[in-house]
């Protein structure tokens, strides 16, 4: 969580000035894409578990199906939270199932993401890389030849007082810390509205960027340096995300779990690919591959896949997701809070149907707003 806050806290400081009207126009379709993607994953996979898997294995818990979106979309943290809630309500295996789907989701995000990147590069659907098999040597080896090396920034402070790199690192940490404080403050006064730290850090970064631009402070902030810092934090985030993978085997539920995972991967792929082509006017594949990594594994996996097809993050996919996630966070928190209670009381199907109906309403709004795009 700290590294994610640092990544998104540094983004606004390295972004060029754009009008809020332009941002809102750009983020609207991304909000619809991300919100519908979350709701449909819960609804479709949950209903598949209730009305297909339960027919084959009737002794399974009604909430068995929703343990896949718990692990895929939510990740290990959400799996632990919902699993613990179910354990308190009498279903002891929930945590293990959630952790298993979260781990499998990370693996699927990497393997499936790389296959999609190769397909997109081959069919000229990527904006920043060419054929996957003909990538430049520097992208394959990770080492730049002398004639292709860029400056990582310029000195804006005297090393007698403070080193430039230290100054910029401290600035990013301040942004992330303020984002954390805002998130915790909201949590104290409005416990249900638990805003993620990274979104708060991004908003704080935007506010400070406006303040810096209105004064002379921005003259001493190097965009290249903050961009490199964001990339460095991203590298550490990816490494920590991969290192945190915990492999587990649940023998008791092996067969239904395999069926659930196969069906879940297919459903999530259809949602990600179909909606990604129709709710992104620009850089549709870059936005879609980031969503795939996030919705099956973790945000770190999404960032890793995005950096393969967009090494310099020129598509602004991460910026847009940070803004779009703000109105999504409360709905996600409500799901995490009420899913165990509703399923234990036999009302889970109504929750899943509500997610499905809300998804259709958002898609209708996207069509009315002109966000829906028809691609061949």
Where are these regions (language model features)?
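Interfacial helix-loop-helix linkers and transmembrane-helix boundary segments
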Residues: 14-33, 213-227, 244-258, 280-284, ...
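C-terminal transmembrane helix pair
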Residues: 240, 247, 257, 261-371
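Structural signature of multi-pass alpha-helical membrane transport proteins
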Residues: 1, 11-19, 149-157, 166-228
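Structural signature of hydrophobic alpha-helical transmembrane segments
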Residues: 1-7, 62-69, 192-204, 229, ...
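Interfacial loop-to-helix junctions that mark the boundaries of transmembrane helices
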Residues: 1, 92-101, 186-198, 221-227, ...
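Intrinsically disordered, low-complexity non-transmembrane regions of multi-pass membrane transporters
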Residues: 121-166, 213-217, 371-376
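Alpha-helical membrane segments and immediately flanking helix-loop junctions
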Residues: 57-93, 97, 104, 116, ...
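Hydrophobic transmembrane alpha-helices of secondary-active transporters
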Residues: 1-25, 203-212, 227-252, 271
């Amino acid at each position: 969580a700290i590294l994610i806050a640092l990544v998104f806290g540094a983004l606004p400081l390295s972004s060029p000035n754009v009008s809020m009207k332009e941002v809102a126009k750009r983020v609207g379709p991304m909000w619809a894409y991300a919100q519908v993607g979350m709701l449909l994953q819960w609804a479709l996979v949950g209903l598949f578990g209730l009305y297909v898997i339960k027919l084959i294995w009737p002794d399974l818990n009604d909430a068995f199906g929703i343990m896949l979106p718990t692990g895929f979309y939510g990740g290990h943290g959400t799996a632990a939270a919902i699993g613990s809630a179910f354990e308190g309500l009498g279903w002891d295996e929930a945590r293990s199932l959630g952790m298993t789907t979260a781990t499998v989701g990370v693996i699927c995000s990497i393997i499936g993401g790389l296959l999609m990147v190769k397909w997109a590069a081959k069919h000229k659907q990527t904006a920043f890389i060419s054929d996957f098999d003909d990538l430049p040597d520097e992208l394959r080896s990770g080492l730049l030849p002398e004639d292709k090396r860029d400056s990582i920034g310029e000195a804006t402070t005297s090393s007698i007082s403070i080193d430039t790199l230290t100054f910029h690192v401290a600035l990013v940490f301040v942004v992330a810390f303020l984002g954390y404080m805002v998130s915790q403050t909201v949590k104290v006064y409005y416990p249900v509205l638990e805003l993620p730290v990274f979104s708060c850090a991004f908003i704080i970064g935007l506010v400070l960027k406006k303040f810096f631009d209105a004064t002379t402070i921005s003259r001493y902030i190097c965009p290249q340096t903050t961009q490199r810092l964001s990339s460095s934090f991203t590298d550490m985030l990816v490494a920590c995300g991969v290192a945190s993978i915990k492999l587990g085997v649940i023998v008791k539920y092996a067969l239904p779990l395999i069926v659930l995972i196969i069906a879940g991967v297919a459903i999530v792929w259809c949602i990600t690919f179909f909606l990604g082509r129709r709710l992104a006017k620009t850089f549709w594949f870059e936005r879609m591959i980031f969503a795939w990594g996030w919705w099956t594994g973790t945000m770190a996996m999404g960032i890793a896949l995005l950096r393969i097809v967009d090494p310099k993050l020129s598509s602004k996919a991460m910026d847009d997701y940070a803004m779009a996630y703000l109105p999504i966070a409360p709905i996600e928190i409500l799901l995490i809070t009420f899913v165990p209670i509703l399923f234990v009381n036999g009302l889970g199907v109504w929750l899943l149907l509500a997610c499905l109906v809300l998804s259709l309403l958002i898609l209708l709004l996207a069509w009315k707003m002109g966000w829906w795009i028809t691609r061949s």
